A protein has these predicted regions:
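Ubiquitin-like/PB1-type beta-grasp interaction modules and other compact soluble beta-rich domains
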Residues: 1-160
Length: 160
């Protein structure tokens, strides 16, 4: 029997096809709390906390943009319950009722990927997260609280 297929070439084509597939993102589907819009910013707020987020990618701090979650397609002329006002990393988490708000809500509102597989389009490396200096494996499921200091570290693997 003659093998008319070069198995090595077939494997290379399969690898190329896998490499060309778009990355899936945790932000592809909005967390239900991410769809909630604040139309009135007043004293009736039952929840108003400020955790701080720092993102370090391969040793370089990544700037979190100002006005993330403000005046978006989902919330025109309004704010999402998780948003920023400046690029300091201070997250504003506000709502008319108290809720357990996971970190993924902010990333979904921002339109960025984050979980144990990576952050943004960085995948295949190591993701670590600390909360107030203590390692956490909760990643996107971490519940936000006032004055938390959340630091996400991404380190590329060799050859990435």
């Amino acid at each position: 029997m003659i093998n008319v297929f070069d198995d090595d070439k077939e494997e290379q084509v399969e690898e190329q096809n896998l490499a060309e597939e778009p990355l899936t993102s945790t932000a592809d589907e909005m967390h239900p709390l991410g769809n909630y819009c604040l139309t009135d910013h007043n004293s009736s707020m039952q929840m108003h906390i400020h955790p701080y987020l720092t993102i370090i990618i391969d040793g370089q701090e990544y700037e979190i943009p100002s006005n993330a979650g403000i005046d978006t397609d989902t919330c025109p002329s309004a704010m999402h319950m998780t948003h920023t006002h400046d690029d300091s990393g201070k997250l504003h988490v506000e709502n008319y009722t108290k809720e357990d708000v996971p970190l993924e809500v902010f990333f979904d509102v921002w339109g960025m990927h984050f979980n144990e597989t990576g952050i943004f389009d960085y995948r295949g490396g190591t993701v670590e997260m600390t909360v107030n200096g203590t390692a956490s494996q909760d990643f996107e499921k971490h519940i936000l609280a006032d004055q938390q200091n959340i630091v996400i570290f991404y380190t590329s693997s060799q050859g990435e």
